């Protein structure tokens, strides 16, 4: 439902940019996310829409109360990220749509500059910013699609030996991310898409409940001739894991979504010959990550 009585800074039908934030028990991070958008809007009209997937912590109500220009759609159940993103697409009309995690904050640059980058690169179906961890280090958003060898190597070694050559290739570690360049995909924590791409390839695949939905969209867009662009002109800080958690269930869900992606996009021969190996590697990685997470909490 749409909560009535919210003051709006701009008519949503006239906004140049729509920002879609899917919330699920994000606590005070959502309020901070919204505050960063207000502080770094720039000279652009913005329609901010929070879609809540049945949070129990009241974060959506408290955050929107503090930011009355924000619209709220409150779902009675958790519909998953892709389905909620699609709700946001249907509920907005702006020519550009920014999908932003509730545990992410715009840190450098403005929303206006984000859109300007997209306008300067009309062939870009996705624009992603430089993403930083809370300690200021650079998170490797903007990656290549790994081949089977690198995917399995990263799955086995990435959590314990991040300097291994498989992970280095996957993360494009030889690039310092100070330059704008085309990549295979960017993190869904923050990505801007021109609305016209949804007419070209459709909306997000709702069979991806959580994880790999941005990877799937990037692959579909690149297959249709669009580019995926990384830009350092905008920076986002992302508190990874607040929106999703690091439970064993979430780690297994991540592996399941990645498996679903490879099953969907790889050729029949690849599926027939190597998919069981990839699935085993992904599940083993989930178990190893869970062991590491439990050890970290002690």
Regions found by a protein language model. Give the residues of each.
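A conserved acidic beta->alpha catalytic loop
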Residues: 36, 52-60, 77
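Short, flexible, basic/aromatic active-site loop/helix in glycosyltransferases
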Residues: 146-183
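A short, conserved alpha-helix in the catalytic core of glycosyltransferases
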Residues: 176-235
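Non-catalytic, C-terminal membrane-associated alpha-helical segments of glycosyltransferases
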Residues: 246-298
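Short aromatic/hydrophobic "clamp" motif used to bind/position activated sugar donors
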Residues: 97
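Short, acidic, metal-binding catalytic loop of nucleotide-sugar glycosyltransferases
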Residues: 35-45
């Amino acid at each position: 439902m749409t909560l009535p009585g919210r003051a709006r800074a701009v008519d949503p039908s006239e906004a140049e940019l729509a920002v879609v934030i899917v919330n699920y028990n994000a606590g005070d991070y959502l309020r901070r996310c919204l505050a960063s958008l207000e502080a770094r809007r720039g000279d652009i009209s913005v329609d901010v829409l929070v879609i809540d997937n049945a949070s129990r912590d009241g974060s959506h109500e408290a955050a929107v109360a503090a930011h009355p220009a924000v619209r709220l759609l409150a779902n009675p159940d958790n519909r998953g990220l892709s389905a909620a993103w699609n709700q946001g697409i249907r509920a907005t009309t702006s020519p550009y749509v920014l999908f932003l995690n509730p545990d992410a904050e715009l840190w450098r640059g403005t929303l206006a500059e984000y859109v300007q980058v997209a306008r300067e690169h009309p062939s870009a179906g996705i624009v992603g910013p430089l993403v930083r961890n809370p300690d200021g280090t650079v998170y490797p958003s903007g990656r290549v699609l790994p081949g089977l060898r690198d995917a399995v190597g990263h799955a086995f070694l990435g959590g314990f030996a991040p300097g291994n050559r498989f992970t280095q290739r996957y993360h494009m570690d030889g690039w310092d991310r100070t330059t704008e360049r085309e990549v295979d995909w960017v993190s869904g924590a923050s990505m801007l898409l021109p609305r016209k791409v949804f007419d070209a390839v459709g909306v997000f695949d709702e069979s991806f409940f959580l994880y790999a939905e941005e990877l799937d969209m990037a692959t579909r867009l690149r297959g249709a001739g669009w580019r995926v662009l990384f830009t350092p002109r905008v920076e986002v800080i992302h508190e990874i894991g607040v929106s999703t958690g690091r439970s064993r269930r979430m780690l297994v869900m991540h592996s399941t979504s990645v498996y679903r992606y490879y099953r969907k996009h790889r050729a029949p021969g690849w599926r027939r010959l190597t998919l069981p190996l990839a699935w085993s590697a992904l599940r083993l990685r989930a178990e190893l990550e869970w062991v590491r997470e439990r050890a970290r909490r002690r």
